[in-house]
Amino acid sequence: MERDIENLVIPQHVALILDGNGRWAKKRGLPRTVGHKQGCVTVEQTVEDAARLGIRYLTVYGFSTENWKRSAEEVGALMQLFRFYLKRLLKIAKKNNVRVKMIGDRTRFDSDIIDMLGEDPPIVMVSINRLEDETAANTGMTFVIAVNYGGRDEITRAVRHMMMDCQDGKLVPENVTEQTVASYLDTAGIPDPDLLIR
């Protein structure tokens, strides 16, 4: 494989929309959660491969704002899987010099997923904030995890933030440019994807 890609132009930013894990499992007569677990294994391998190939940004859209409409049982299972996956991802990121950044609305997640308060429990849990903090100095690929993310939701939150800054006198409406709007988005500082795969 290495020889085959030697002369190819590697995209700077690849984005993956994770879709169909539940259907994959159902087609094989397995519970949907098995499909989600297999999806995580695939993402882990993809992170390592993308970092090795020299891709600068890899974005995975893994849990959209629409996913909260699934059954409480499935959402609960996905949150447990997310907790487990964050711990594994920290090891992978450190091993591969990968910086991790999460985009999306964090407000709906349980506090242990967002930030660990006090001492770590005996089984070390990794929060999103800890994962971002501990990989912030890594200089390799940036792995962007889009969770509880939706484009319309992102724009809505950005506009609200801009309006508050206008009310506080930090922003003058007449001075708002495309770059100003971009700076309020979750994706500020992240280039647009060159390749989107679903």
Which residues are covered by each model-predicted region?
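Flexible, compositionally biased loop and terminal segments
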Residues: 1-198
